[in-house]
Amino acid sequence: MSGQLVQWKSSPDRVTQSAIKEALHSPLADGDMNEMNVPVDPLENKVNSTNIIEGSPKANPNPVKFMNTSEIFQKSLGLLDESPRHDDELNIEVGDNDRPNANILHNERTPDLDRIANFFKSNRTPGKENLLTKYQSSDLEDTPLMLRKKMTFQTPTDPLEQKTFKKLKSDTGFCYYGEQNDGEENASLEVTEADATFVQMAERSADNYDCALEGIVTPKRYKDELSKSGGMQDERVQKTQIMISAESPNSISSYDKNKITGNGRTTRNVNKVFNNNEDNIGAIEEKNPVKKKSENYSSDDLRERNNQIIQSNESEEINELEKNLNVSGRENDVNNLDIDINSAVSGTPSRNNAEEEMYSSESVNNREPSKKWIFRYSKDKTENNSNRSTQIVNNPRTQEMPLDSISIDTQPLSKSFNTETNNELETQIIVSSLSQGISAQKGPVFHSTGQTEEIKTQIINSPEQNALNATFETPVTLSRINFEPILEVPETSSPSKNTMSKPSNSSPIPKEKDTFNIHEREVETNNVFSNDIQNSSNAATRDDIIIAGSSDFNEQKEITDRIYLQLSGKQISDSGSDETERMSPNELDTKKESTIMSEVELTQELPEVEEQQDLQTSPKKLVVEEETLMEIKKSKGNSLQLHDDNKECNSDKQDGTESLDVALIEHESKGQSSELQKNLMQLFPSESQEIIQNRRTIKRRQKDTIEIGEEEENRSTKTSPTKHLKRNSDLDAASIKREPSCSITIQTGETGSGKDSKEQSYVFPEGIRTADNSFLSKDDIIFGNAVWCQYTWNYKFYPGILLEVDTNQDGCWIYFETGRSLTKDEDIYYLDIRIGDAVTFDGNEYVVVGLECRSHDLNIIRCIRGYDTVHLKKKNASGLLGKRTLIKALSSISLDLSEWAKRAKIILEDNEKNKGDAYRYLRHPIRGRKSMTNVLSPKKHTDDEKDINTHTEVYNNEIESSSEKKEIVKKDSRDALAEHAGAPSLLFSSGEIRTGNVFDKCIFVLTSLFENREELRQTIESQGGTVIESGFSTLFNFTHPLAKSLVNKGNTDNIRELALKLAWKPHSLFADCRFACLITKRHLRSLKYLETLALGWPTLHWKFISACIEKKRIVPHLIYQYLLPSGESFRLSLDSPSKGGIIKSNNIFSFYTQFLRGSNLRDQICGVKKMLNDYIVIVWGRSELDSFVKFAFACLSAGRMLTIDLPNIDVDDTEPLLNALDSLVPRIGSELSNRKLKFLIYANENNGKSQMKLLERLRSQISLKFKKFNYIFHTESKEWLIQTIINEDTGFHDDITDNDIYNTISEVR
């Protein structure tokens, strides 16, 4: 029976299966079923109906559907269902003369494969654990064998139909019977459960089995017969439609004929049937004489038919690669049913593995598949995740192909040509030139050759399957390989020409330092696509891709395609030549279109620019360098030339040395320098970054900084101080002294006045200082130009030397170890370092344990006492000092802001050097403190200070730091009001700062104003007033020498006696002012506020200023209208233990009366309250309020004050104070004729809560100790002093009248 077609006719959606006698089945059929020696019911295997359709969709359900991944790899797939069921409704039409004489099983519920394919196309495969079981449609369930029934069918007898191919009526599948014996009358077929997309195998007819049992082929016998045949070139081949994968073709397995075992059951043998070589294509030889006589087709006829089919397929329109893999719906083309076996067998075993492999009974019994399983992924959208997605792949080596034999057919295929996809295990092509832009050729025909080239593919191999030697080779000619060119890097791209684009996977062109030929050395790079590029270079001429395959090609295009990179300091040369190839300027100008300039590397080889040259080169060295420069220029006339002047950009390097410093070129004529800068600007017109290559780093800056400035940039704008250089012990004056303005010699008089400076001689300290027993004062200043400089970015303090005061830029030039810098006046302080100060060195905290002077060079940074070296010990986390001592230069240390606030400062007043003066800046609360301290900053010269003769420039700028000259804001600052004229004002509704003379001869002190402080200050100054930065105490002298001492200094070294009297400082400009007040927003307990209350002067709200300006004068009633209270009085509180007090009004009656009389401020201090004029004040201890305490006692009319310098007294240890009083009180009493005296013992200590206990203990001890004296003792502290100022009363109730004591003290004076 030949050309027999079998079709399921139970429904339009029934599957049509094809079978052949020598059946070639798909890999999926072999993989899904994998059944060997499956027993069949012997009752149904009779002589006349031996061939049963085995594997119909419902006979044996696909076991993969009901197995997880582990079961697929570990268990056998046989014996799934042994109970066949019959169906009586199935009729089969046979398209040949022969009819089977037995019934076949009828599949009652054939699944709709189209619906299944559509389902898996839009849905992903379920998980590994429950593979394909989540689909609940009943249409997928196969009909069990028990429900299948045998049916007979008739076949046409027309002999013309024997060699015809009929178009199938079903759209879902087909089957084709190969040539069979014409003598067969009946045939019984069993359809497997594989999808219709794979050709199923037809079993032999009953006649073939009736001939003899020895005709049955066993595995062993098959191998023997196959070896005897010697080749299968002349064997007739069955024509079978093969289902292949578009990406990873696999080898093909087929069924052998069935055999009947001894127990009466029919078994089925499975073996490999193809050796897929062009010279050796054959089928299974069954050695059956009946079969030999019944074969009708030869292999030559089959090849001829296949060629016709392939030619028909070539006429199809070629779509894109994604569309090529879709199923073709054409039903009119009969040739679509057949595909050449050569194109189907993609995974072909090599000749070494030509021997057929068969399943053995041991593999069945052990239920372990001997082939590997691969879940393959494909871009095909037609049948994702179908039940064929799990297949047995015989040939794992699918990543190699012959070079000369590949031509992939990308025409639309039939619907049965599907791509199996599954994402569980991916076989993915990573890099392949065949996957892009390959034109369609003939159907896949693969030939095995010796030359192979691997295609980069990632594949998962089964551990139990040995790799075969079948390979794929790269085709000889590819229509086109579309490589995406890599764009050039923006920094190096040419603005005028894009000469070459490289393949996407190629390596970058090696950057040769001295070459401009981009084609040079291209051949030396290893390109993985070099073979592909050479094969496809002719086809890719339409693209702008220039690929140099050899050095000869580069030499030919060297001149025409060369790109010149114009650099300022590099000559144009080839990297491989020793001689420099120079182009003329005309040639360079004519090739502007091929000359490019790198935006980032325009000035890559510019010489080094040193802005600090004036500080780092001595005049002698400059002269030597100038001579050297002239000699070098004679030998290198073209070392730096520009193309704009018909010169060539060239800067050679000899012996690896760096380029010459631009600082040397500065000393040429100004004409040459300006011409150089002009040419540089013309050469680089774009605003690109300039690269200055220094010895250590490469600095980048904007192009507009190419001019070499005479002055250094302001140091406050830098992110960090200049890096410290190594200290050079043999540094001479010439190395630092660059010009007269940079001289470090101390000058007197006004800077920049043109007068000759007078150098002074200094006495340098000797030895190593290890202790400081007293605080520093202005008497210790030897080097007045030694300063601390606060850096504005990190607020650290660095040592330096004050060079000069720049009046134009309102700052000072400070020399550091790394150079000089312009610094603001308020950031400069005296370099007053002492033993015990905590400093920072190399990021760690150290304590100064010694000071030493090792050099007498005036240009070395040293402190005000002359020490230039410090001895340091590291401070541990526990606070203890380490044992190791470091000796470092003073210029290498710095101070943190926290340590700066804790240390004692130099005392610049004429008072004695005590702790209170050293820490006086702490008397201001932090909230009201404007800066670290305002009294230590060297200021610029002013006209008012010309007549003051001081020994140093710094101290000259800081004359009488507590006087009004330093503390007030000069009226010259009124000129700056023009800049703020348009600024909105909070003081006036009009929003303008008016000018006038409302506050002429008036002084103001501002405190606790943070929002509109500056605006208020400008407003006062615009109306003629003066703002004092510190309090009113700086306007007075309140300590005076005594005319007669009450104690003998020889016996009391730690006791000092002062005469307190409030008096204006001499030459004061404010004594003749008519009005003074403090401006704030509320009543406070600040020092400025308390000083104003002690003087009896008004404390006013800040709106008093705007009210007076509106009235255009100071109206007297406005003073009381905006007068603020004096503060909280705890003495007026009814409940004294309570924390709160009573707000008391301010009493300014005396001041107000004098103001109405027109008196000036000189007369305003005459009416100071005399509350302590009959008391002898004894102050012991030190604090930051020492100056305020003296001023307050002077305002309260305390005539005499004695200070006892004692260490801090503990509550449990008051003996030192009692012993001092025991010797002092009797002597005072004897000097005052033993009269009744009043003593006020004031504890100038900050002991917090323990102070009250200390006061109570002292009161009791003093009363007991001096009980025999008829004296009055009062022991008080800071809170009492504040309450006395607020309440205008001491709170003492003594029996002795004030007049008696006052007269007694007056007699002593």
UniProtKB/Swiss-Prot annotation:
Keyword list, A-Z: Cell cycle, DNA damage, DNA replication inhibitor, Nucleus, Phosphoprotein
Pfam family for this entry, one: Rad9_Rad53_bind
Location of the region described as Disordered in the Swiss-Prot/TrEMBL record: 1-39, 280-299, 342-365, 490-512, 636-655, 691-731
Feature: compositional bias, Basic and acidic residues: 284-299, 642-655
PROSITE patterns named among the record's database cross-references: BRCT
Location of the BRCT domain: 994-1122
Modified residues (Phosphothreonine): T218, T471, T474
GO BP annotation list: DNA damage checkpoint signaling; DNA repair; double-strand break repair; mitotic G1 DNA damage checkpoint signaling; mitotic intra-S DNA damage checkpoint signaling; negative regulation of DNA strand resection involved in replication fork processing; nucleotide-excision repair; positive regulation of transcription by RNA polymerase II
Subcellular location: Nucleus
Biased composition annotated in UniProt, kind: Polar residues: 1-19, 343-352, 491-508
Main localization of the protein described in the UniProt heading: nucleus
Modified residues (Phosphoserine): S26, S56, S205, S248, S312, S315, S462, S568, S729
GO molecular function: double-stranded DNA binding; enzyme activator activity; histone binding
GO CC annotation terms, alphabetical: chromatin; nucleus
DNA damage among keywords: yes
Job of this protein: Essential for cell cycle arrest at the G2 stage following DNA damage by X-irradiation or inactivation of DNA ligase.
Note: Present with 400 molecules/cell in log phase SD medium.
PANTHER family in the record: TP53-BINDING PROTEIN 1, TUMOR SUPPRESSOR P53-BINDING PROTEIN 1
Record's subunit section: Physically associates with RAD53.
Protein name per the record: DNA repair protein RAD9
Organism from which the protein derives: Saccharomyces cerevisiae (strain ATCC 204508 / S288c) (Baker's yeast)
